[in-house]
């Protein structure tokens, strides 16, 4: 569960290392974001030769959360980190590689490019 001021680890090679969420998209009263949701974030830490710099405002899609994801078949899944991938306005990832597994819910939300770049979809 991601909310305002949550810090996320970036799991792609766009140049950002950490981002801080400052708006969950999807309505004025929406407070929490889960796997597959889009949030607006600010880059807190970045590689010096990356395509994004510290302080840039970016859109990210959440691919892993520490809180449980409950599925329709009754299983629960959770990850060690809160992670995200930077995306552009057309919902394509800014990076060319994704590190670590991605939850199946990302593919169900029509982020097919992200799930195809991921080494593993859980």
UniProtKB/Swiss-Prot annotation:
Q: Which cysteines are joined by disulfide bonds?
A: none
Give the top-rank taxon of the lineage listed in the UniProt record for this protein. Bacteria
Listed SUPFAM superfamilies = Ribosomal protein L14
The alphabetized list of GO BP terms reads: translation
Keyword Magnesium attached:
no
Is Transcription one of the keywords UniProt gives this record? no
Q: Which Pfam families match?
A: Ribosomal_L14
GO terms assigned for molecular function = large ribosomal subunit rRNA binding; structural constituent of ribosome
Q: Which UniProt keywords apply?
A: Ribonucleoprotein, Ribosomal protein, RNA-binding, rRNA-binding
Task: Provide one Gene Ontology cellular component.
Answer: cytosolic large ribosomal subunit
Question: Which HAMAP family does this entry report, sorted A to Z?
Answer: Ribosomal_uL14
Known partners and oligomeric status: Part of the 50S ribosomal subunit. Forms a cluster with proteins L3 and L19. In the 70S ribosome, L14 and L19 interact and together make contacts with the 16S rRNA in bridges B5 and B8.
The text of the family note is:
Belongs to the universal ribosomal protein uL14 family.
Q: What does the UniProt function comment say about this protein? A: Binds to 23S rRNA. Forms part of two intersubunit bridges in the 70S ribosome.
Q: What is this protein called?
A: Large ribosomal subunit protein uL14
Organism encoding this protein? Protochlamydia amoebophila (strain UWE25)
Q: What is the lineage of its organism?
A: Bacteria, Pseudomonadati, Chlamydiota, Chlamydiia, Parachlamydiales
Q: Which gene encodes it?
A: rplN
């Amino acid at each position: 569960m991601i909310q305002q001021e949550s810090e996320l680890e970036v799991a792609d090679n766009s140049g950002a290392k950490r981002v801080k969420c400052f708006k969950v998209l999807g309505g004025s009263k929406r407070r929490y974001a889960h796997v597959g949701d889009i949030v607006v974030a600010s880059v807190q830490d970045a590689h010096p030769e990356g395509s994004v710099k510290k302080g840039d405002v970016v859109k990210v899609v959440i691919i892993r959360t520490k809180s449980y994801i409950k599925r329709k078949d009754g299983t629960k899944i959770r990850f060690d980190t809160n992670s995200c991938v930077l995306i552009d306005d057309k919902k394509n990832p800014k990076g060319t590689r994704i590190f670590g597994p991605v939850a199946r819910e990302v593919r169900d939300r029509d982020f097919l490019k992200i799930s195809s770049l991921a080494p593993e979809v859980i």
